[in-house]
Amino acid sequence: MWYNMRAMNDKGEKDRADFSVGRVTRFYVPLLMQAFSQSISYPLVGGITTHGPLDVNGLTAFAQGQTIMFMIGSLGGGLVMTGMVHARTGGGYLAFRRLNFIMMAALLLLQCLPALPPLDSLVFSGALHLPPELAAVARSTLLWGVFMNASFFLRNVPMVVLFNNLQSGKANAATVLRILLTLALAIALPRLGLVGPAWGLVALTAGCFFEFFVTWWFARPYVHALMTSRQIPWHSSLDDLMAAKRRYLMVLEQLRFTLPLSFGSFILAASPLAIAVFVGRTADAQTMLAIHYVTIGVANPIGFAALRMQAVSIAFPPAFKGDRRMLYYAIGAGAVLGAALLAFCTPSLANWYFGVYQTVKPEHLHYARGAVAMYGLWPMLQAVRARIEGIAAVRKLPAAVMAGQITYLVALTTTLAITLYLGVTGWKMSVCAINTATVCTTVAVYAALKVMSRRKKR
């Protein structure tokens, strides 16, 4: 049955772990720390960006260029989950590595197009309504962000190998080293007078490539073990047409698995752009966008950490029908993460981080504190959603995940449109839309799993 996935997979190898709170926590905490430290890089370089000549508005332009970069990169967003499901043998690993390279090359080329004439003016000045000086910052951030996005794709392969060997601690160590380098640059560059969006991008890119090299180094022995045990020949002669066909079919199988997940990731990545379009049409739009970006910069690391429950769900699927132990674990973990997020509502921390570090004006600080308070429930919603999406991945039903992610964008834009019509303040619009969309996503994935399960039984 689908719920007894931990014993043996379809190729006969043991690839799932038995549930216990201690074992799950030892696997999840490094993932949580990795996600948190990975996402905290952006608030760090926010200090470099906001101290440039454009102040906090420079962060708005920088964030919009990065948003488009991540939206394009998200078309490969299903690759990590694909690797965790399919890259558990030597042949599967090599097929995954080839697929990852093909998608990286195609998407990096695609990333350059909106940053070049004539599309750049249509995107930044037209759709996003950015003034010329901010449009120029967003354009250059997107164009030179090609190097940063490349590091993410390159990291996919060794990171998947570590996750599949339950070595999330080593993946976390690489990310911690990345955050330390980014922190060092965030301190050093402003002291050298190197501030503004361009230097913020330099700090991010340097840390990302450093993380890739460390992750690759940690994964080397596990890759060697995979290669020595592979069952499907890869480096065979050109005359071996059967082997070539089998290699092609493996890549094609993984591509078919990753496309629905990646399309869904693209839909999710498009959501910040949708928020920017709606909030940009509210009263005092520049202030509202700035508040949105500085507060989502705090909420995203914790929300992303909660979403890592997807990987935990793949490693620890249900052992029997009605097994809800991981669901309860996800709820508890999300509640703890939400409590940590609420620390940014306290006056002392809020005044320092938003007022001093991110240069938010004193009269706008209560907006930032209010937004963070409204995000308090979001980590729990994210963790529950991630648990259900992980089950869909284990059952090799990426269409269920995609259904949820389509629902996310529909719910997000619908909520934004309604709140804009009602005259809701810009920063409240974004938080309400994100929370509502997350709930709708969870319901949609769960419903899709139920429907697809019934079809399989027929």
Where are these regions (language model features)?
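Hydrophobic alpha-helical transmembrane segments
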Residues: T141, A173-H224, R230, W234, ...
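Small-residue-rich hydrophobic transmembrane alpha-helices
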Residues: L59-Q111, R155-N164, I291-F344, R385-A393, ...
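Hydrophobic faces of transmembrane alpha-helices in multi-pass small-molecule transporters and flippases
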Residues: R16-I40, L142, V146, G169-A173, ...
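Alpha-helical transmembrane segments of multi-pass membrane proteins
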Residues: P131-P158, V298, I302, K361-I388
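Helix-terminus/linker motif at the lipid-water interface of multi-pass membrane proteins
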Residues: Y3, S39-T60, S125-H129, P190-L194, ...
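Alpha-helical transmembrane segments of multi-pass membrane transporters/permeases
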Residues: L94, V161-I187, A198, A319-G332, ...
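Short membrane-interface helical motifs at transmembrane helix boundaries
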Residues: L109-R139, A339-R369
